[in-house]
């Protein structure tokens, strides 16, 4: 099976920035191609200031694109739990991501950059207003897609929506099964594919 990590990371980035309107503050792909940086962290980190809670929220991103949605959900949440609930200081993967984040922070607006750095400084009072969250992309084979032209587009759309509604309860239960992950804010994108292997091949042909 070809590695589609980059495809998932790119799709996650597009969805988070276009739909959730959150900028990506740490991108995994440039770090992986930098020989001076050994990176095995999240599939990107995104940030926004939440006016409701008055906190700066960092979203750790995870993407999994499998043929089976159950395995994709489980692996995605397992990875996310390791990042968000990992305890200890200094040498955890979350802390290593934070160090890379601080070192590679690069915004066009120097005032925005300075403000964000205040939230990342443990010695600054703003650090108490930093909140960790999660965002996931789960891609899977959707059986509602026909293998021929026997269904019209509206029919396929309705079937997929109904199945996604069924998946919602499964998502909630999987988060509860991975407590304390269920205590965190976690955004989930479900992306149905006609065939994930075809998607892999097409993506690989473009890079």
Question: What are these language model-derived features?
Answer:
Residues 1-13, 34:
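A short, highly charged nucleic-acid-interacting micro-segment common to nuclease
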Residues 16, 44-46, 59-65:
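Conserved catalytic cores of phosphodiester-cleaving nucleases, focusing on short active-site segments
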Residues 20-36:
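A short acidic/basic microdomain associated with nuclease active sites
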Residues 55-83:
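Active-site ExK catalytic segment of metal-dependent nucleases
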Residues 74-154:
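Acidic, metal/cofactor-coordinating or nucleic-acid-engaging core segments within structured domains
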Residues 151-207:
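Extended, charged low-complexity segments
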